[in-house]
Amino acid sequence: MFRQEMARYPKKSIKKRRVGRRKYGSKAATSHDYSSSGSILVPENTVKVFRIEPTDKTLPRYFIWKMFMLLVCKVKPGRILHWAMIKSSWEINQPTTCLEAPGLFIKPEHSHLVKLVCSGELEAGVATGTSDVECLLRKTTVLRKNVTEVDYLYLAFYCSSGVSINYQNRITYHV
């Protein structure tokens, strides 16, 4: 009797369900225009902030790093990129920003509920390959511990003379 009940649930249907759960981007973000606009250029000496809306209940370190590498497309040779990823539940309107070397720290005006996930700075060399940039980022990255809570992630960039950032449907909006 037990074997007959098990036969009612074939393995194929279970596999189909798992494929649908692999999408990490939110459904609301896929309908935004930002997902199809490709890359943008961050102006000189300005802070650009992106909000990442995770749908997974746990956000492990490797997923944070993979998400970050998808965002950074190209850094111009000779330019210094300061960046930071912060986690908080506040809405960014006009954040108070201050630079700390290495990396970038953002503090909101009306809240102190900010947790710095990772930060660093990158000085791009002559080689503009993605693998070279990824290697430089790994060397200069300071990754904080215990980043598993469900929350919004904010990714901030500050570049000495512009940086090209490629963002996909994982970004809900940018400020």
Curated annotation (Swiss-Prot):
It holds the Pfam family Nanovirus_coat. Belongs to the nanoviridae capsid protein family. This is Capsid protein. Residues 1-35 are annotated as: Disordered. It comes from Banana bunchy top virus (isolate Autralia) (BBTV). Keywords: Capsid protein, T=1 icosahedral capsid protein, Virion. GO terms for cellular component: T=1 icosahedral viral capsid. Residues 9-25 have a biased composition (Basic residues). The keyword Transmembrane helix does not apply. Transmembrane segments: none annotated. It is found in: Virion. The gene is DNA-S. Coiled coil: none annotated. Its main location: virion. The keyword Disulfide bond does not apply.
